[in-house]
């Protein structure tokens, strides 16, 4: 009597929907007696939970874990039925070795969300298995026995093998199957919302690439036609005028004005701009000689004035003679290293002088215009084998004259620049796609967009089935391919 009251109370409490767990996520355990609210899904299916429960939280179900076993296939009702038979057979073999407490099935929580399905221990709340929805390929419940429920999930890794996980619950197997299907529908809708925009952008990229290929093909055709026309024109010119003197170019044009042979005719020969010629005659006018000035015996010069005075006034002065018209000497190029007299040179006075040094004085070079002079010749310099534009060559070291190592940002810039350099052509480089190939790619994207619009996209479809009336636990059948002598402790 007390047991029946406990079951009735448990069923009434399990009808509370939308409670909050410790982590603040929504969870629900639908009742088997209360009528359930139906929600229409995006794929035409009927949902039993509000979408927010699975999107923002999760839905929890309490069940007992029967066990798991590997399966040869990832889907199929026959595969799940055979796996459940194998699990029950293994449990019955171990029942004789177990006590009454250990023989009980483990009680677990099944947490279903839009991201994954988690199997956790009901006492410790520690997750036992975590299955992303993408790894679950098949889900089935028994239409006759409402307690049996199983799903097939693939193990982690690319080469993970599928395994069947079986559970028993208090007439909630169908609800668990519908909840997992609802999670798949919502994940599928989220996938469409995220990928529809990317597919449309990919379609536009393919259209632009196709246009580029068409323009490049047209440009190549025009280049070939132009080269053919130029070859035809050059052939016609060769037949008419003969081979050209300058290959590829026409003869140069002659200048219209003649080249001048001398200075302009309107400049007189006595001008300072005229240069002496070989046939010029020497000047006929010579400079007058001046009278010698004699000195007296006492050393005083006689009073000789250039102009004598008279009572009537000063005598007129004789105008100075006009200098002869002499041509200037030819220009002389300046010397690069003029010779400096050692007597009047400051360099000679400071020769061999070195201030503030205890070492013997070294003779300084006498040529102050020597280009090889280096004032930093005594300093220690760092020599680099090759200049690295992305390295830290511009940062000189402060210890022992060593170079500072390149920074991480400089190495990153160098790697990015090297990656952007055009790679040499090799056999591994794929050839360029043609316009027909881009047409095929555009058609594939359009098919995916059409499938998204109609809801027939193949991604995220969960296959469901019926276990077909699993026999009772006492009337199980022996699986055909699950007999293991080592596990059964039997002699071969």
From Swiss-Prot:
GO terms for cellular component: cytoplasmic side of plasma membrane; phagocytic vesicle. It is found in: Cytoplasm. Residues 373-383 have a biased composition (Basic and acidic residues). GO terms for molecular function: clathrin adaptor activity; scavenger receptor binding. InterPro entries: Adapter_Engulfment-Domain, PH-like_dom_sf, PTB/PI_dom. May function as an adapter protein in a pathway that mediates recognition and phagocytosis of apoptotic cells during normal development. Promotes engulfment of cells at both early and late stages of apoptosis. Required for actin reorganization around apoptotic cells. Plays a role in protecting dopaminergic neurons from oxidative stress-induced degeneration. Mediates recruitment of E3 ubiquitin-protein ligase trim-21 to the apoptotic cell surface which promotes ubiquitination and degradation of ced-1. It comes from Caenorhabditis elegans. SMART domains: PTB. One of its GO terms (biological process) is positive regulation of distal tip cell migration. Keywords: Apoptosis, Cytoplasm, Developmental protein, Phagocytosis. This is Cell death protein 6. Belongs to the ced-6 family. Detected in gonadal sheath cells. Residues 19-38, 241-385, 464-492 are annotated as: Disordered.
